[in-house]
Amino acid sequence: MSRIGKKPVTVPSGVTATVDGQTVKMKGPKGQLQFLVHDDVEVKFENGQVKVAPRAETKRARSLYGTARAQIANLVEGVTKGFEKKLEITGVGYRAAMQGKNLQLALGYSHDVVYQIPEGITIAVPKPTEITITGIDPQRVGQVAAEIRAYRPPEPYKGKGVKYAGEFIFRKEGKKK
């Protein structure tokens, strides 16, 4: 049995939770999110807590209900605090700038890369070498960060490229004569 799944998710004041069949909806100060729970997982909302339990004692149901509980906890955190990812740009001439509703990246290519910011995501550029991505859905925030990083992943020799803040890049030694 999942230890994570056994704990109920407490819904704080200011957040309204509704469970409609297999759909869990959370509405809070930052916005509204919903999550479709797998059929093998049972969801109940009572006394300001969302409780999750497996419908059957199968291995699949036991593994899914811990995941469902974590996803519901992310919904609560998303509509109250939101999620944030930071990226760092390293390299001579590598920089980022906001251009209207788009993110313009100079990453050493012959042209600038223009990234269209999806709905529900906010991108800020406090410095030309830092990008901050915020939103209420952790999956979308992480996906946007991964897409931006994929334009120029950090290389192991000089460490140039786009990396997550705090990410360690394994460095390699160059050729020897």
Curated annotation (Swiss-Prot):
Biological process according to GO: cytoplasmic translation
Gene: rplF
Assembly and interaction partners: Part of the 50S ribosomal subunit.
Sequence similarity: Belongs to the universal ribosomal protein uL6 family.
SUPFAM superfamilies assigned to the protein according to its UniProt record, in alphabetical order: Ribosomal protein L6
Keywords recorded for this protein, A-Z: Ribonucleoprotein, Ribosomal protein, RNA-binding, rRNA-binding
InterPro entries, per the entry: Ribosomal_uL6-like, Ribosomal_uL6-like_a/b-dom_sf, Ribosomal_uL6_a/b-dom, Ribosomal_uL6_bac-type, Ribosomal_uL6_CS
Species per Swiss-Prot/TrEMBL record: Bradyrhizobium sp. (strain ORS 278)
One GO MF term: rRNA binding
NCBIfam families reported for this sequence: L6_bact (TIGR03654)
Superkingdom: Bacteria
Function: This protein binds to the 23S rRNA, and is important in its secondary structure. It is located near the subunit interface in the base of the L7/L12 stalk, and near the tRNA binding site of the peptidyltransferase center.
Coiled coil (residue ranges): none
Protein name per UniProt: Large ribosomal subunit protein uL6
GO cellular component: cytosolic large ribosomal subunit
